[in-house]
């Protein structure tokens, strides 16, 4: 006969309910054979509260009741501390409006999930992230608070830097168009040309997947995986990322970089985390919902796209201040992206294909023309929209000598294909995160610091 394991629980209670009603709810939970209610946390409300004495409240409720320092503020920090103290599996929310609202509940959820516990209420439940503890090498995870904020560009930059510093890394990346079985790409051995990528595309391979981009930009070993669906916290519906990590265990690499997809988080345990926040994102998505949860995971936060028209100085400052309030231990670095062609474009007429928003087109064109002495005859921001991309290519292709394209979305099956058929040279383009206020070494040193701490953590776990 199947028996449920005992679930250790903490309950959140308030002073907006009469004590006998709250006590009845707690006793209902505790009467279930698989639930053991260890303690209560008073989170606010005074309308029906007869006592503010923890001792008296504890006696009435028949179990420990904990209060925060200020009865008018949610004791977020205390909730995390008591989860650890009691080894709680679940935090049950028995509170309600007006003590809690949606934003406060998401903030509580971020704290609870960050401690690896379940956050449950009458009609909701948030589960902690799936994390398979299977890697046999030190690792870091690169994740983000959304899509199109430069995660793959930063991952490629970090991988290249980590490789240059002789840590012998590989990247395990998951994407919406990844392979059915984990796919190894020897970016360190093969020459990844436009013609080679077209051959892969003709075989049915999504040759603009993140692991191909990482291999091309960083010239290192990569493992490509797929995923479908993305939850609110970061879990996915299906993925072969676990098998991808197991593949990485067998490869000739000494350090593993796990790369997320959109706001989805790889379901593999890592030693350390780098979190990307896009300054172009709405503040509500950064400061609410599960933005704070992701920020709370970080050892290093890289804020991308910190320039007009995507984000002004005031917004960037607000984002940085919020990150530091949520995770004061994390280093925060603000950056902008600048294109870096992987081939020679000096003196050439360039058609530039990108995923960058149309609002920064003039800035990128000016940068390419001034830094690389080329002439940009046309641009398209529609790499992720095949019909519009095709339209833009047809509009500009006769004036161009070179197709300069990021390796994203339709870069191979449309941009590369059409350019090669028209007799154009195809050159792929990297995006480099450039430190906004300070020296580039600050970013490099911060990334290597995370790597060193990941290695130290891994070695400590190995020590008997």
From Swiss-Prot:
- List GO molecular-function terms, semicolon-separated: ATP binding; cyclic 2,3-diphosphoglycerate synthetase activity; ligase activity
pH dependence comment: Optimum pH is 6.0.
Cellular localization per UniProt: Cytoplasm
Instruction: Tell me what turns on expression of this protein.
Output: Constitutively expressed.
Reactions mediated catalytically: (2R)-2,3-bisphosphoglycerate + ATP + H(+) = cyclic (2R)-2,3-bisphosphoglycerate + ADP + phosphate
Q: How does activity depend on temperature?
A: Optimum temperature is 65 degrees Celsius.
The entry summarizes how activity is regulated as: Activity decreases in response to phosphate limitation.
Record key words, sorted: ATP-binding, Cytoplasm, Ligase, Nucleotide-binding
Which named protein is this? Answer: Cyclic 2,3-diphosphoglycerate synthetase
């Amino acid at each position: 006969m199947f028996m449920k394991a005992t679930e250790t629980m903490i309950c959140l209670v308030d002073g907006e309910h009469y004590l006998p009603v709250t006590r009845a709810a707690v006793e209902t939970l505790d009467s279930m054979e698989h639930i053991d209610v260890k303690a209560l946390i008073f989170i606010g409300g005074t309308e029906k509260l007869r006592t503010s004495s923890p001792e008296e409240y504890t006696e009435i409720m028949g179990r420990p009741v904990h209060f925060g320092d200020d009865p008018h503020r949610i004791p977020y920090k205390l909730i995390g501390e008591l989860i650890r103290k009691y080894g709680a599996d679940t935090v049950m929310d028995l509170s309600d409006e007006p003590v809690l609202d949606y934003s406060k509940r998401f903030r509580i959820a971020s704290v609870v999930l960050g401690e690896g516990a379940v956050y449950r209420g009458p009609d909701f439940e948030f589960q902690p992230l799936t994390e398979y503890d299977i890697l046999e090498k030190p690792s870091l995870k690169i994740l983000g608070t959304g899509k199109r904020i430069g995660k793959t560009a930063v991952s490629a930059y970090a991988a290249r830097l980590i490789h240059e510093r002789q840590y012998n890394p590989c990247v395990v990346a998951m994407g919406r168009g990844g392979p059915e079985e984990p796919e190894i790409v020897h970016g360190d051995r093969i020459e990844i040309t436009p013609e080679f990528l077209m051959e892969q595309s003709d075989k049915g391979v999504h040759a603009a997947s993140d692991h191909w981009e990482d291999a091309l930009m960083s010239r290192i070993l990569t493992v490509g995986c797929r995923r479908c669906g993305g939850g609110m916290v970061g879990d996915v519906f299906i993925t072969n990322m676990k098998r991808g990590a197991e593949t990485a265990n067998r490869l000739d690499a000494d350090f593993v970089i796990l790369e997320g997809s959109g706001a989805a988080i790889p379901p593999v345990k890592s030693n350390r985390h780098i979190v990307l926040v896009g300054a172009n994102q709405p503040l509500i998505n950064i400061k609410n919902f599960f933005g704070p949860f992701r920020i709370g995971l970080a050892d290093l936060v890289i804020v991308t796209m910190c320039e007009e028209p995507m984000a002004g100085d005031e917004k960037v400052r607000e984002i940085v201040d919020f990150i530091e309030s949520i995770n004061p231990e994390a280093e925060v670095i603000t950056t902008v992206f600048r294109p870096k062609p992987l081939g020679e474009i000096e003196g050439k007429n360039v058609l530039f294909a990108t995923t960058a928003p149309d609002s920064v087109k003039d800035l990128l064109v000016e940068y390419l023309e001034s830094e690389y002495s080329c002439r940009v005859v046309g641009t398209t921001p529609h790499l992720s929209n095949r019909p519009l991309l095709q339209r833009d290519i047809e509009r500009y292709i006769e004036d161009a000598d070179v197709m300069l394209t990021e390796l994203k979305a339709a870069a191979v099956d449309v941009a590369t294909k059409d350019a090669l058929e028209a007799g154009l040279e195809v050159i792929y383009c990297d995006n480099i995160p450039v430190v906004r206020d300070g020296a580039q070494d600050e970013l490099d040193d911060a990334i290597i610091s995370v790597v060193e701490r990941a290695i130290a953590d891994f070695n400590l776990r190995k020590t008997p």
